[in-house]
Amino acid sequence: MKIRILTIGQKMPAWVLTGFEDYFKRIQPFVQTQVIELPMAKRGKNDSDADILKYCQIEGESILAALKPNEVLIALEVGGRELSTEKLADTMKSWMLEGHDIALAIGGPDGLSDQVRKAAAWHWSLSKLTMPHPMVRILLIEQLYRAMSINHNHPYHRA
C-alpha cells in the first residue's frame, strides 16, 4: 500500500511545515507516503458564490488529474464519516491486505468540488469542526501515523 496526500495549496506557514514534516518522517518506515501540493485557484476579495464554485471546480480538476488509475480516492470533508483512531487503524489494515493504494484529497479554503466528491470512494471527516486546510494536513498525517503505530504495535498510541 502507498498513500498519497493530494492537497490544495503550496505555500504553507512554517508552523504547518514543522508539524507536518515531523509526522511525515515518522510514518515512512510503516507506509510509503507522498504529498502532492496542487495550486490553489486565485481568489479575489469580493468573490461571488459563482466565483467560489468556479475555484472549487478548478482545484477539483487538478486533484482528479493528479489521481493515479490504481488509487482509491478518499475525500476529506466535514460531512464525511467520522472514525475513532482504532477504527482507522483497522481500516488501514484492510487497505493494506487488499493492496489498495490510497489518495487522500484535501480541498482548498472553500472545500472540495462536486466532481471530487462524486469520484471519491469514501468520505472521511477528521472532525465536525470546520478547520483551515493547512491544519488538516497536520491532523491527517498525525492520525495516519497513529493508526500505523497501532498496527505495528509501536508504543506511540497510549489510549
From Swiss-Prot:
SUPFAM superfamilies xref list: alpha/beta knot (SSF75217)
Cited Gene3D superfamilies: 3.40.1280.10
UniProt GO cellular component terms: cytoplasm
Main location, first listed in the record: cytoplasm
Methyltransferase in keyword set: yes
Residues that bind S-adenosyl-L-methionine: 76, 107, 126-131
Keyword set, alphabetical order: Cytoplasm, Methyltransferase, rRNA processing, S-adenosyl-L-methionine, Transferase
Subcellular compartments: Cytoplasm
Coiled-coil annotated spans: none
EC number, UniProt record: 2.1.1.177
Family matches, as CDD domains: RlmH-like
InterPro entries: Alpha/beta_knot_MTases, RlmH-like, tRNA_m1G_MTases_N
Pfam entry (one): SPOUT_MTase
Family label: Belongs to the RNA methyltransferase RlmH family.
SUBUNIT field: Homodimer.
Function description: Specifically methylates the pseudouridine at position 1915 (m3Psi1915) in 23S rRNA.
Protein's recorded name: Ribosomal RNA large subunit methyltransferase H
Organism from which the protein derives: Acinetobacter baylyi (strain ATCC 33305 / BD413 / ADP1)
